[in-house]
């Protein structure tokens, strides 16, 4: 029966993988719902306050770029050629061979440069033209040939074109998507969890599918009780920090994190899913690798290490078991549990795996940095070629002996190694850090310039264009059987109690890596959700032509901000009523649907604006004269933050104004006033609304 369950788990997992690759959006079991377009009023202020409404910030985001491009291509004739030129350059930069770049560069030059020059309408500098012409005459076509044009295209787009985008519906859509992104609160219900694919000291790793996009991931779940039992809180939190540091920027050679979240019992990392097994497993199955095959793995690992080191992260646990293969055979560095940030302070702890640890790591109290990883790389490459670490002769398991040999033994390289390979390994395995390859001031560049890699084009390595020496078998789960992986003994943690102080440690644990979420959405449901939302909004616009739009009331007035919130609706404070609010310098107005009367609360009636919590949801509490309270709830975190800020600012400024004006005797009045207003259907420019 157990065997049957294992087979069914494998089949279910493989089917999910195949469907996710083909049509991930079709596998989505939840729908992303974009907020109302009126969210723009709040989100624009929220983003502006954080310096996010700039050309550079929006153009560099995946969804921002897609919406900006769409606006230019469909609605702005003068910007269309610039965006098309930009896209052709980006395609050129990704070409694999010099021959392809030569053909493509000529086409780009003829279409976007020469044609414009002949028409005397080329809006670019003479230096940019000369730069490209000079290279093409010599048949030199580096990937960055058109970089001067990229800079000038962006310069031309960031002025009036960008301002028109900000005023358009496409920016409204950007605000809608950013609101969704900034309000992500993941739980286990947001994933379909499949079979277990691995286990570590604190928890397990599962294959899973994200419900709203259909994308497959690996879910690494750490048990909070087990962490507490082993006093591993610092390690768990450190892994989350290290993953957040390396998971930005384009690096296909590290198992990166897209999300982190936690439940009362577990810490969860949502990571890139790697289906091809690890190099330790393949070394045991395949046998040792040739120099050519090892070169392939070494090159991709070097680029992974370079990405980490550029972010001042030293990995500290480089070994074949931590190098995972994807379904095509390309590799990624996994498990950053021992990684360390050395930007402010160099580490000196002796951590890692014996047989791969650098001498300076083994010497207690000695500080080190990325130097440790280059020594470990030398050890690992030796193992791929010979089947054992250079310091683990005759399969000894004595850790002290392995460490002693690492500190004292001169590594003897076999005569069968090529001179180029010997040079590389001798450089990496130098005990003296000041003489070690990769530690002489230029980092990874020194290693990449080794004669052993002379035949490689590093741009081709980065683009993963070299054929992998080993392709994992398709239609198989390249992981141990679920029953072989086993499970933890629950008795171990039976006596462990999680206190409020334990949970407080993980208060800031949840995280969404913005660029990875945007990439996931762009690859899966972006077009579908946009099309559906466009249809919905078009229907609402037709319907609202008779009633008018909520936003219309704010036009031509000194309205600071407007949007939907929910307020407590009766004296017993038990029911929420959704209303549309308008914040003015001296008052807060709101209304219901259709022709419901407009209500008003003046700033002079407010005594304070505070944040409170009702049923675990953050709310705004407005204390009003006479001991009354006014409670407001927002649909998202950014809205709550911005409404709180703007209400407090308006209240503070109103208070300062009152203090400057001589006091007048007023009759007591009701704090909330109901306005008899013209129904929205009758509003127009004639009455200034």
Swiss-Prot record:
Residues 1-190 are annotated as: N-terminal. Keywords: ATP-binding, Cell membrane, Cell projection, Cytoplasm, Kinase, Membrane, Nucleotide-binding, Phosphoprotein, Serine/threonine-protein kinase, Synapse, Transferase. The keyword Phosphoprotein applies. The modification Phosphoserine is found at residue 670. Residues 558-652 form the PH domain. SUPFAM superfamilies: PH domain-like, Protein kinase-like (PK-like), Regulator of G-protein signaling, RGS. GO terms for cellular component: cell projection; cytoplasm; cytoplasmic side of mitochondrial outer membrane; cytosol; membrane; plasma membrane; postsynapse; presynapse. Residues 454-521 form the AGC-kinase C-terminal domain. Transmembrane segments: none annotated. Ubiquitous; brain, spleen > heart, lung > kidney. Its main location: cytoplasm. One of its GO terms (biological process) is G protein-coupled receptor internalization. ATP binds at residues 197-205, 220. GO terms for molecular function: alpha-2A adrenergic receptor binding; ATP binding; beta-adrenergic receptor kinase activity; Edg-2 lysophosphatidic acid receptor binding; G protein-coupled receptor binding; G protein-coupled receptor kinase activity; protein kinase activity. In contrast to other AGC family kinases, the catalytic activity is solely regulated by the binding of substrates and ligands, not by phosphorylation of the kinase domain. InterPro entries: AGC-kinase_C, GPCR_kinase, Kinase-like_dom_sf, PH-like_dom_sf, PH_domain, Prot_kinase_dom, Protein_kinase_ATP_BS, RGS. The keyword Transferase applies. The record marks 3-4, 10 as: Required for receptor phosphorylation. Gene3D superfamilies: Phosphorylase Kinase, domain 1 (3.30.200.20), Pleckstrin-homology domain (PH domain)/Phosphotyrosine-binding domain (PTB) (2.30.29.30), Regulator of G-protein Signalling 4, domain 2 (1.10.167.10), Transferase(Phosphotransferase) domain 1 (1.10.510.10). Coiled coil: none annotated. Belongs to the protein kinase superfamily. AGC Ser/Thr protein kinase family. GPRK subfamily. This is Beta-adrenergic receptor kinase 1. It comes from Bos taurus (Bovine).
